[in-house]
């Protein structure tokens, strides 16, 4: 345990302000893994603590706890694990000027139960997870004297909640112990504003201020409340008299802001500040208290299909924030960290963030307010948490009210959901949702994501409606599709956890895990790859699988945008998810740094407030066909596109324009998806295989799509005296090889023992979801002469669709180490077996090429497969086909069914 020995620790009370005392700094400290101190007033357990720690921090920062020897496969490994009570202590001199005031001990963020002792007496305990802990200590503190304040933070599970809740799971942010953010004593006069909520009314250009005033004097207090509203080039003052007769008095005041109010939204995140000063007197004694909050003039309603903000439909383009913070192990509480994350979010054209089964600290709300990001917030609730358990239910009831009170004024807080994929007693979920709607109508509410709807739902995050499956997790080899027929169910539907296509881990990231968690699972993955003699290909696997995931995201997002009846989508996620099996599904790493797979500028071509869209039926065509495109525009930007010029063009791989045209200049509406017109291009002038790019620009926005054009081929796979084409490895093929000739073996996929072949890379991650075939794309050895007449990159793209969907993956663990397939399928990182669809080898005196692709099924409708076979034919009939790696006949027979 790294800790300093304390000689004396007395805090004299250097307050930042006269009514606040900053308590950050050194505290006496002691762990209590056996829980000896809890609830005991025995003198043995009330001694001065002998170690020290500096707050705000967490125990992991000081290497406190059990040093883990493990290498967790399914998550990052916490280096120093501590779960249990930890004690913090300081002697503090309470200012004499605080006599007669109410005194609170404030922790901005802690985890999970905090208990406070003054001297030997336990005086307060709080178990919120989502909001600050504010302990009133008035009764036990004596201004002008030194007091020994001890508090205990217990990060054990206080209730039987789901172990994956992102608020306290080791799978995301760690289950830390400590205090973060502000730690302070606060003194207020006995008549003070306990709560102040601002309710905007944009129709009447006014606000309603709802206040809770506490009077602890036991006498009537009379005075006034002074309101001061400021904004951009705006000031308003108002005073109202007030009489506080009871211990709690509720006050409402309406304020007209004027004719020219500034609304808050993603494009114009205008903010106002309300400063309130309560001055009062009781029996000649004067009191004063000030409270401030920011707010935005915005109203949220549930439309038929979309969320309505300030009277206009919006469309959410979001990601899920899963509390992944490997640098610190906890969610940051400072503005700069959240501003960075949310600016990156907006840089990628997104306007929305869902906090999956957790609620962020105030800094996240402040920065979302500032930058114009729509937030959906949840409690730490998941799975079985709705099953009957009154203690747990009461915790959720308190947590809900706390979240609404603490963060309710933030205009970015437009959506609330109880939690993730909840099961159990949905009458309890309905109770929570109905209660929230009754308490605070400033946002929309939903019972749960992706499970059963409840009566009070105002929106629903799901992949399934009563009309069918409307989730979108991968693209298709065409773009003329959407999910509109599965929608139109009477309330806004947001697509649940879209995307989730796995990328091979980038082992270069391992050096970045310098905080309380380490990527020791990467060590296991790397060792497996090394054991299978492919470590030199690790970065190629990352690049190839990552390129495919980026391609998938473009198609997933464009399909979401074409689905005009959908209220929005949430990716899972823009950055990697480090738990539940480790899911590297993001185009950003866990630290929100780029992986180098796609630039923000390119991403914004298909994910932005305004996006040009194109519907077409094929990505791979013959040159006797006509490409036909139907242009659309997704426009949820701030304005109409007046007199928008619409241009299209088709270019070859060198950027040369082959054909261009214009569609009708028109004014495009906003808050919807609008058809623009059609165009076509006859491909008969394309005589050689080509990759073409279709470009579409609408006013200032542009987008593009790749297509592949091939000539038709007949008489494919024709054997000669030197080259034998066959689907079976029979005696004829063996003799051909023994004679020093060439054989091309294309076994039917049903005759290969290996895995299913698919275009898409694995969903989510292979450790949690062990769904076959457990592959994550292909590495194409495009520099080899076999691809001289087949256009490809090092990764698969849409021209590979019909090839891969009609193939079989050969498991090649018994192949010679040096043998690398030219179509190399990337195995999941928890296995790292060598896999292939096509390879070549020397067998006896001959040369063998194996291609585990169905070369007969609907071959006239498969232009890319035809072209691959043509390229192979030219290759094997040339001198370039000269395999150097030798395999036995028995190896070939080992992966073929008899």
Model regions: which residues?
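Substrate-binding/catalytic cleft of secreted carbohydrate-active enzymes
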Residues: 342-343, 352-588
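Accessory beta-strand-rich segments of carbohydrate-active enzymes
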Residues: 30-34, 78-79, 83-193, 216, ...
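Extended carbohydrate-recognition surfaces in non-catalytic/accessory domains of CAZymes
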Residues: 16-106, 162-172, 176-179, 578, ...
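Active-site-adjacent substrate/metal-binding segments within catalytic domains
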Residues: 62-94, 98-118, 124-127, 190-197, ...
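Aromatic-rich peripheral "rim/lid" segments of glycoside hydrolase catalytic domains that contact
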Residues: 439, 572-637
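Beta-strand-rich binding/interaction modules
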Residues: 116-118, 206-243, 251, 626-665, ...
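Extended acidic/polar, glycine-enriched regions
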Residues: 142-146, 214-301, 678, 685-716
């Amino acid at each position: 345990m790294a800790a300093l020995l304390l000689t004396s620790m007395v805090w004299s009370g250097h307050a930042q302000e006269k009514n606040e005392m900053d308590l950050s700094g050194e505290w006496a400290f002691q762990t209590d893994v056996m829980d000896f101190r809890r609830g005991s007033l025995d003198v043995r357990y009330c001694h001065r603590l002998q170690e020290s720690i500096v707050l705000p921090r967490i125990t992991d920062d000081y290497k406190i706890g059990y040093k883990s020897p493990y290498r967790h496969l399914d998550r990052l490994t916490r280096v120093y694990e501590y779960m249990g009570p930890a004690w913090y202590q300081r002697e503090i001199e309470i200012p004499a000027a605080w006599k007669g005031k109410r005194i609170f001990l404030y922790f901005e963020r802690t985890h999970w139960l905090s208990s406070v002792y003054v001297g030997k007496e336990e005086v307060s305990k709080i178990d919120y997870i989502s909001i600050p802990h504010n302990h009133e200590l008035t009764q036990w503190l004596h201004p002008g004297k030194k007091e020994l304040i001890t508090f205990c933070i217990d990060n054990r599970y206080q209730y039987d909640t789901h172990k994956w809740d992102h608020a306290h799971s080791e799978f995301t942010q760690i289950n830390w112990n400590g205090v973060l953010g502000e730690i302070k004593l606060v003194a207020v006069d006995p008549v003070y504003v306990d709560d102040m909520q601002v309710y905007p009314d944009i129709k009447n250009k006014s606000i309603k201020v709802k206040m809770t005033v506490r009077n602890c004097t036991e006498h009537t207090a009379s005075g006034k409340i002074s309101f001061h509203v400021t904004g951009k080039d705006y000031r308003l003052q108002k005073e109202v008299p007030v009489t506080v007769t009871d211990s709690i008095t509720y006050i409402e005041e309406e304020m007209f802001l004027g004719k020219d109010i500034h609304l808050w939204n993603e494009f114009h995140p205008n903010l106002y500040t309300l400063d309130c000063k309560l001055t009062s007197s009781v029996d000649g004694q004067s009191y004063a208290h000030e409270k401030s909050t920011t707010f935005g003039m915005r109203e949220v309603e549930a439309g038929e299909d979309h969320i309505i903000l300030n009277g206009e439909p919006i469309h959410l383009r979001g990601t899920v924030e899963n509390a992944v913070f490997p640098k610190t192990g906890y969610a940051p509480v400072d503005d700069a960290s959240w501003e960075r994350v949310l600016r990156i979010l907006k840089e990628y054209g997104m306007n929305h963030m869902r906090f999956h089964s957790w609620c962020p600290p105030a800094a996240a709300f402040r920065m979302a307010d500032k930058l114009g990001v729509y937030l959906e917030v949840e409690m730490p609730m998941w799975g079985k948490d709705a099953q009957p358990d009154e203690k747990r239910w009461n915790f959720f009831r308190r947590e809900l009210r706390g979240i609404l009170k603490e963060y309710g004024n933030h205009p970015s807080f437009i959506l609330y959901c109880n939690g993730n994929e909840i099961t159990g007693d949905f009458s309890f979920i309905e109770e929570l949702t109905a209660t929230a709607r009754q308490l605070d109508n400033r946002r929309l509410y939903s019972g749960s994501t992706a499970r059963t709807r409840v009566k009070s739902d105002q929106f629903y995050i799901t992949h399934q409606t009563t009309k069918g499956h409307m989730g979108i997790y991968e693209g298709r080899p065409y773009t003329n599709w959407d999910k509109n027929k599965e929608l139109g169910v009477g309330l806004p539907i947001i697509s649940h956890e879209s995307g989730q296509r796995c990328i091979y881990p980038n082992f270069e990231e391992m050096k970045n895990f310098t905080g309380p968690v380490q990527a020791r699972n990467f060590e296991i993955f790397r060792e497996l790859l090394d054991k299978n003699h492919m470590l030199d290909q690790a970065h190629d696997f990352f690049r190839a699988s990552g390129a495919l995931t980026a391609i998938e995201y473009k198609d997933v997002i464009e399909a979401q945008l074409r689905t005009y009846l959908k209220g929005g989508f949430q990716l899972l996620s823009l950055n990697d998810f480090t738990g539940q099996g480790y899911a590297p599904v993001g185009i950003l790493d866990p630290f929100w740094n780029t992986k180098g797979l796609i630039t923000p500028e390119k991403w914004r071509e298909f994910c932005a407030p305004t996006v040009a869209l194109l519907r077409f039926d094929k990505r791979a065509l013959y040159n006797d066909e006509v490409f036909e495109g139907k242009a659309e525009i997704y426009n949820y930007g701030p304005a109409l596109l007046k007199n928008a010029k619409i241009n299209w063009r088709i270019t070859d791989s060198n950027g040369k324009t082959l054909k261009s045209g214009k569609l009708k200049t028109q004014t495009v509406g906003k808050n919807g998806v609008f058809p623009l017109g059609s165009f076509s291009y006859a491909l008969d002038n394309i005589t050689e295989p080509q990759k073409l790019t279709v470009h579409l620009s609408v006013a200032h926005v542009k987008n593009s799509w790749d297509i592949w054009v091939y000539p038709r081929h007949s008489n494919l796979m024709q054997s000669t005296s030197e080259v034998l084409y066959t689907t079976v490895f029979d005696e004829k093929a063996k003799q051909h090889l023994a004679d020093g000739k060439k054989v091309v073996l294309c076994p039917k996929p049903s005759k290969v023992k290996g895995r299913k072949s698919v275009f898409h890379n694995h969903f989510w991650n292979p450790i949690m979801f062990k769904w076959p075939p457990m592959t994550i794309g292909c590495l194409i050895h495009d520099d080899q002469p076999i691809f001289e007449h087949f256009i490809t990159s090092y990764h698969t793209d849409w021209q590979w669709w019909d090839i891969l969907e009609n193939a079989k993956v050969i498991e090649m663990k018994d192949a010679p180490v040096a043998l690398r397939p030219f179509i190399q399928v990337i195995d999941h990182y928890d296995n790292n077996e060598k896999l292939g669809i096509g390879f070549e080898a020397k067998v006896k005196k001959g040369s063998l090429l194996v291609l585990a692709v169905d070369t007969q099924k609907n071959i006239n409708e498969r232009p890319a497969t035809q072209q691959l076979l043509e390229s192979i034919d030219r290759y094997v009939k040339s001198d370039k086909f000269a395999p150097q790696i030798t395999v036995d006949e028995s190896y070939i027979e080992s992966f073929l069914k008899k």
